């Protein structure tokens, strides 16, 4: 039987969903094949992990999806699920990951990057050619700070919300 430690939690705004993910994995893992332990990442001590144990990463957001957990585990020779540190870092940065997809001719929706101090020009063709759009922060999970904008008078408000994350 293989030892699996399911880590969840963390300090990000996605702690609650991470906890739900960890508990769901623990509840549904095949107990006849795996000896599973559910562990809050705050209690993880890499020096106590056995060599043949696999870490199942259920940590969402900062610390779990940005490459930091992957780096910690890889640097200590611990096997884990999911992508490598470099892949996680790249995916965490939406601008960089979108650029890589475009470079490799993978279709992505049109986008506009709005820098921190950039003044918004609603007469820009990008805005004029759309009935609605989504505003997302460059980093963080897939749902925090995301707004669908159908009234462009509310675009500034959506951008302010995204910048919180």
Predicted features and spans:
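Conserved ATP-binding module of the ATP-grasp superfamily
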Residues: 108, 144-165
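ATP-grasp fold ATP-binding core
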Residues: 101-102, 126-146, 164-165
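Short coil/turn connectors at secondary-structure junctions
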Residues: 1-2, 52, 109, 129-131
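ATP-binding N-terminal substructure of ATP-dependent carboxylate-amine bond-forming enzymes
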Residues: 1-86, 90-92, 96, 103-104, ...
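Short acidic/polar capping segments at secondary-structure boundaries
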Residues: 114-119, 138-142, 151-155
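Short Gly/Pro-enriched turn/cap motifs at secondary-structure boundaries
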Residues: 59-62, 137-138, 162
